[in-house]
């Protein structure tokens, strides 16, 4: 009888605790991750950077035809392709969606974060800086400021820019 009561208690506790550990976000959102669309000048150059330097993986791609792009308000009738990258191939991982319209940017390249408005940088938390720094060196990517530098006892900080000038903060242990 005692074992039955303990089992029943555990079953009830797990049933009521399960929603607290759910992967579904509360409120109005269907996913807890954010998908970010980034327009780049040269898709192949950006894919090379994000896959080989940053270490993202390509998970899928799709096209948006001219009429559909206009209908959705995404462009004034320009067709485009989107390549989805993630830090890991997981449904829960945030999506980094790259697309190109084959045009040069209409604004100068930023040298520092406050040089423009809008999204200016992303922060990626890494398990170890060593493989990231090796890839940065291998692909001749310039680190900005006096980086890598220590943030605190346990974490280093590196700042780089992608081929279009978007800033990427990398934070993690040495």
Predicted regions mapped to residue ranges:
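Core segments of cupin and vicinal oxygen chelate
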Residues: 39-93, 151
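Extracellular structured ligand-interaction cores
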Residues: 33-35, 53, 80-82, 119-121, ...
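Active-site beta-strand termini and strand-to-loop segments that position acidic
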Residues: 85-90, 160-163, 173
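Bacterial N-terminal signal peptides
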Residues: 7-17
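A generic structural micro-feature
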Residues: 28-30, 74-79, 113-116
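Vicinal oxygen chelate
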Residues: 40-44, 59-60, 92-93, 99-167
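N-terminal beta-strand motif that seeds the catalytic metal site of vicinal oxygen chelate
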Residues: 20-45, 60-62, 68, 119-122, ...
